[in-house]
Structure formats: C-alpha cells, structure tokens
A protein has these predicted regions:
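Conserved catalytic-core motifs of GNAT/GCN5-like acyltransferases
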Residues: 135, 153-167
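GNAT-family acyltransferases
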Residues: 1-111, 122, 126, 168-201
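Conserved beta-strand-loop-alpha-helix junction that forms the acyl-donor binding cleft
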Residues: 134-144
Length: 201
C-alpha cells in the first residue's frame, strides 16, 4: 500500500479538496445548515470551533494517520461537508473512511455516493489497500444505514470504544470492504449514481 498524500479527487458532481484553513467559512456554513453540531453522536464542530476542527485534522495529516478533505458540490460551487481517511495503516494495507458529514440540504442526495466512489476508487486502485473500514456510533442509525447502503459488510461492535464530545463513551459499529469485494461495490455505486442522474434530468 502506498501511503496516502494530499490529492484532489473529482467526479460525479463533487470535488474533494485537501482540507485547509482556507475552507473555514465554507465548512462553518455547511455545519450551520442543520445545526449538525447539536447531534451529540457526530464529530461536527460548532461553527465557533471550526478553526480548531480544521487544525486538528491538518495535524493528523502531518502525523501520517489522517487525510482530510472538504467536499465541494460543483453545480453550486459550495462546500457541503467534510470527510477523511483515518487510522491509516500501510503495514496492513488498511485505512478507514470517516469523520464524514454533510449539510442537511445535501443529505440523501448524490453527494455521499459520489464521495465514497471517489474515496474507495483511490484507496483500492491507486493506494493498493486490501481493506477499507468504516466505524460509526451505535446510536447513529442514519450513518449505519448509509454505510450498509454502500455495500460494506458489518464486522461487529466494539463496546465501550471511544469517547464522545459530551464525555460519554460510545460503542462503535465496525464495517469493512475487502479488495476482492470492491468490483461489485464499485458497480453498485456507479449504478446508484446513474439512477440519480436519470431522476434529475
């Protein structure tokens, strides 16, 4: 596996731009669409904490265990969310996709499918990952449904796993896609995007 480096990924109406402080206002505005920070089981920062949120992500990138992006929707030119590679482990050819959130206006749109197709294609076909993982809070049922809709398989639940922002400790629901499963998942995601395109024209 090649160690991930900052890169712009674009396709299906979205562009993933390496996250920097230049995205501050766009990220803050996207989080404000739906007041996403009020969902206690998410990783979305209060707009007042956006600078620290971005700085933490960039520091993770420098340390080599994280690669964050801002998500830009191309038809509007707006920043509509953020996502990351994290827990990057070249020793076992594995990384995870997470810290993903979208402005309320863009939830249940083509954006998540388009982003996941870009991220998974890059992970499997460019970086050479053997497995891509996902994790989510046991109470974040929308996230669990979204991950399962991608075609990821549920590996299990790690109990008492991670601290939430409010100080409580969550159970983490773990999912993964293996390299051998990627061609089928890729076809599935491409079909979903084609169906969305047909419905919007």
């Amino acid at each position: 596996m090649i160690a991930p480096a900052p890169i712009t990924l674009e396709g299906s109406g979205v562009r993933l731009e390496p996250l920097t402080l230049a995205h501050h206002d766009g990220v803050a505005a996207a989080a404000a669409d739906g007041r996403l920070w009020e969902l206690w089981f998410t990783s979305v920062a209060n707009p007042e904490d956006t600078r620290g949120y971005i700085a933490e992500a960039v520091e993770g990138q420098r340390a080599g265990h994280m690669l964050p992006w801002a998500v830009r929707e191309l038809a509007t030119g707006s920043i509509v969310g953020s996502t990351r590679y994290h827990d990057i482990s070249p020793q076992v050819d594995r990384l995870e996709i997470g810290y993903t959130w979208y402005a309320a206006t863009w939830q249940r749109s083509h954006v998540n499918t388009a982003c996941k197709l870009l991220l998974l294609t890059h992970a499997f076909e460019t970086l050479g990952c053997r497995v891509v993982g996902f994790r989510t809070d046991n109470f974040n049922f929308a996230s669990q449904r979204a991950i399962e809709a991608l075609g990821a398989r549920k590996d299990g639940v790690i109990r008492h796993h991670q601290a939430r922002r409010d100080g409580t400790v969550r159970d983490s629901v773990m999912y993964s896609i293996l390299a051998g499963e990627w061609p089928e998942v890729q076809r599935h995601l491409a079909t979903r995007l084609a169906r969305h395109a047909d419905e919007t024209h």
